[in-house]
Amino acid sequence: MVEQKDKYRPCVGIMLFNRQGHAFIGKRFESDSYWQMPQGGVDDGEELEQAALRELLEEVGTNKVKVITKSKDWIYYNLPEEVIPICWNGKYSGQKQRWFLMKFCGEDEDIDINYTGHPEFKEWRWQGIDSLVASAISFKKEVYKTVIEEFSSIIKASTISS
């Protein structure tokens, strides 16, 4: 399938993992069923890593991280048809994301999902990477599978060497 690349909002995603190799996930306010990793749009003129660190601070409330790597390619997903008019005034049919793998170097107390006063998440937890896909909303499951496939060996190597 050929995608119309300009119909996808440029975005970054962050897989933040702790010393145990578990990933940070948050439960959004509009859902009681789905959890997600931090993500957000790239501002005009903003470098991707800069956007990822900004989004992490805004959504997770910490900068106590080490950037390990980023995904080799953009990862695309489509929004469900009924959601397109609601998100970004129908300008985009989905998102294209570059994912960053970051190691959390702080303590749980260093995480503050209310950091901005306008939180994205109502609660958070660390979750094993093998069960992340099951916690995600349906249209993001393939993205999470791709991210896990690309980053899981790096996470395992990092937790062994810590």
UniProtKB/Swiss-Prot annotation:
User: What does the record give as EC number?
Assistant: 3.6.1.-
Q: Answer whether the UniProt record assigns the keyword Hydrolase to this protein.
A: yes
Tell me a Gene Ontology molecular-function term this record carries.
Answer: guanosine-3',5'-bis(diphosphate) 3'-diphosphatase activity
Required cofactor(s): a divalent metal cation
Q: Which Pfam families match?
A: NUDIX
Identify the residues that the record assigns to the Nudix hydrolase domain, covering every copy: 7-149
- Domain of life of the organism in this record? Bacteria
Q: Where is this motif: Nudix box?
A: 40-61
**What are the entry keywords?**
Hydrolase
Class in the EC hierarchy, top level: hydrolase
Q: Does the keyword Repressor apply?
A: no
User: Which Gene Ontology biological process is one annotated for this entry?
Assistant: ribose phosphate metabolic process
Q: Which SUPFAM superfamilies would you find in this protein's record?
A: Nudix
Q: What family does the entry list?
A: Belongs to the Nudix hydrolase family. RppH subfamily.
**What does the UniProt record say this protein does?**
Accelerates the degradation of transcripts by removing pyrophosphate from the 5'-end of triphosphorylated RNA, leading to a more labile monophosphorylated state that can stimulate subsequent ribonuclease cleavage.
Name recorded for this polypeptide: RNA pyrophosphohydrolase
Whose protein is this, by species? Wolbachia pipientis wMel
Q: Which gene encodes it?
A: rppH
